[in-house]
């Protein structure tokens, strides 16, 4: 016969488990809006923590002044590109607005449409009918798509608002993390040690190294390439160079490099008979591309003694899997997995493996 106490214990266990799951799910829903901002703040603070300590030392040990200085730097780093982007979009849209608002819109005749086999004449006749109707027929044709266009702009406005919210949260969390960095670091290490007394602290150290390697080897390299490319575009007279600069940053972050933006700019210069500037920009583009292969491994080695290929693989995979925040998540996960496998093969802890690697690198 089953003991009633065992039944009570089982019931209590099930109810406790349900309660814990419910509390955990509710807590996740509460903190979900803040996760992205906190994640970005964590990555930024980890990457720039040595810079903050140097600034604090330079300012005579005043943490508050150093934290304010770092927040101002972050504001400039994020706001200046946004201002450039908005300015470029405004400059691009002004001619279109004037064109649409003018009363004498002149559409091209598109006579070449008649030369298209089979369907060319029919398309040309339909196009001429639209032009002859003074725009009324054209409006009726595009009216079904107006709802989708409006919905698209509403979604983009919502995304813009979310971006500003996450940017504000990122700055607030960065301020808190800079101010209480040591306490938070000790708490994370204690938590990691509770999970694994053998490898906990070493895994935290690996995560920090991976984040700094990405920040230096990928992000800093992308910014340097974008600035150099922007200088070349500005001097050669390519329009909307600020917008192209921002596109180059994203292209470099996803490991495509600056050439997908620079090569079309070179072609545009040649197309407009600016052969001298086109040739100079082509030479400058090759220089910037070669510089990428020199700076990236160098900066990754400064950030940590980790395999360059593993970092870059983590960056690309993380971006595809998690979006922009995956830029840091991917390398961290791959580096930890790599070190766990290597330490398991050699039968030593990650901490011992890291010590041996550090000693070898110092002796070399």
UniProtKB/Swiss-Prot annotation:
Membrane-topology descriptor: Multi-pass membrane protein
Transmembrane residue ranges: 18-38, 40-60, 65-85, 161-181, 215-235, 243-263, 280-300, 309-329, 331-351
Keyword Lipid metabolism: no
Record-level GO cellular component terms: plasma membrane
Entry keyword set: Cell membrane, Membrane, Transmembrane, Transmembrane helix, Transport
Signal peptide: none
Pfam families to which the protein is assigned, alphabetical: AI-2E_transport
UniProt keyword Cell membrane present: yes
Compartment annotation: Cell membrane
Highest rank taxon of the organism: Bacteria
Family that this chain belongs to: Belongs to the autoinducer-2 exporter (AI-2E) (TC 2.A.86) family.
Protein name: Putative transport protein BUsg_115
Protein source organism: Buchnera aphidicola subsp. Schizaphis graminum (strain Sg)
């Amino acid at each position: 016969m089953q003991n009633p106490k065992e039944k009570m214990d089982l019931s209590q266990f099930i109810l406790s488990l349900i309660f814990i799951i419910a509390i955990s799910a509710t807590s996740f829903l509460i903190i979900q809006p803040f996760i992205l901002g906190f994640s970005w703040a964590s990555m930024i603070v980890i990457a720039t923590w040595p810079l903050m300590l140097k600034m604090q030392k330079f300012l005579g040990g005043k943490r508050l002044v150093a934290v304010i200085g770092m927040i101002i730097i972050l504001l400039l780093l994020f706001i200046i590109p946004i201002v450039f982007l908005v300015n470029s979009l405004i400059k691009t849209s002004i001619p279109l607005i004037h064109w649409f608002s003018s009363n004498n819109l002149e559409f091209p005749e598109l006579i070449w449409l008649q030369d298209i086999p089979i369907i060319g004449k029919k398309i040309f006749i339909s196009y001429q009918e639209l032009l002859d109707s003074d725009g009324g027929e054209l409006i009726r044709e595009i009216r079904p798509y107006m709802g989708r266009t409006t919905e698209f702009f509403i979604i983009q406005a919502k995304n813009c608002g979310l971006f500003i919210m996450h940017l504000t949260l990122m700055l607030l969390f960065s301020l808190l993390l800079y101010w209480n960095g040591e306490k938070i670091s000790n708490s994370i290490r204690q938590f990691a040690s509770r999970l694994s007394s053998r490898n906990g602290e070493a895994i935290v150290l690996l995560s920090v190294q991976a984040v700094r390697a990405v920040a230096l080897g990928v992000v800093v390299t992308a910014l340097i390439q974008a600035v150099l490319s922007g200088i070349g575009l500005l001097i050669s007279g390519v329009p909307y160079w600020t917008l192209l600069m921002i596109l180059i940053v994203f292209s470099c972050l996803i490991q495509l490099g600056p050439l997908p933006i620079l090569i079309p700019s070179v072609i545009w210069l040649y197309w407009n008979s600016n052969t001298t500037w086109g040739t100079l920009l082509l030479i400058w583009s090759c220089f910037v591309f070669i510089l990428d292969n020199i700076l990236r491994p160098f900066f990754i080695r400064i950030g940590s003694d980790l395999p360059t290929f593993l970092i870059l693989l983590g960056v690309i995979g993380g971006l595809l899997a998690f979006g922009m925040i995956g830029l840091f998540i991917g390398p961290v996960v791959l580096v930890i997995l790599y070190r766990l496998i290597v330490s398991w093969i050699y039968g030593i802890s990650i901490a011992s493996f890291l010590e041996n690697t550090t000693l070898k690198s110092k002796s070399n």
